[in-house]
Amino acid sequence: MKQRINLVTLGVNDLEKSMEFYQKMGWQTNGIVGTEYENGAVVMFELGGSMMLCLYERKNLAWDSEVALQPASATEFSLGYFVNSQEEVDTVMDRAKKTGANISKPAGQAFWGGYNGYFQDLDGHLWEVGYNPSWKVEE
């Protein structure tokens, strides 16, 4: 198995509301697809290269993976969105707040020398928005 990830799928409670949240954050999608299949409705966001972020109803993800539906937990993992300045972190965090995200940690100086904050989307998924002065993010 080669070291890579092509697809991250987030289990959500309300596909339409979650899609609208990410669209308000500035992400583009062709909308909900796969509705012709039972348990198939999904939203896909192309992230560049061969990487995608998908939204899939939690109950359908449990069905498809044959894993019992579990309570959601925000601390199982976080998604990182890194930018090239502290100002960009502040801009993204402000947009997340205005879009309905829960700001779990306001942006500020990080213990590791950078600048970051955390928010949770409508389903509690944890996003870190950060700036690392030693890491240039390629757009």
Specify the residue positions occupied by each region the protein language model found.
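Alpha-helical elements of the RecA-like P-loop NTPase motor core of helicases
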Residues: 19, 90, 127
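A short alpha-helix capping/helix-coil boundary motif
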Residues: 21-22, 70-73, 99
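Short, basic, helix/turn surface patches
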Residues: 56-65, 78-81, 130-139
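Core segments of cupin and vicinal oxygen chelate
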Residues: 2, 9-60
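Vicinal oxygen chelate
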Residues: 4-14, 43-46, 53, 66-139
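A short, acidic/glycine-rich surface segment
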Residues: 32, 38-39, 60-67, 105, ...
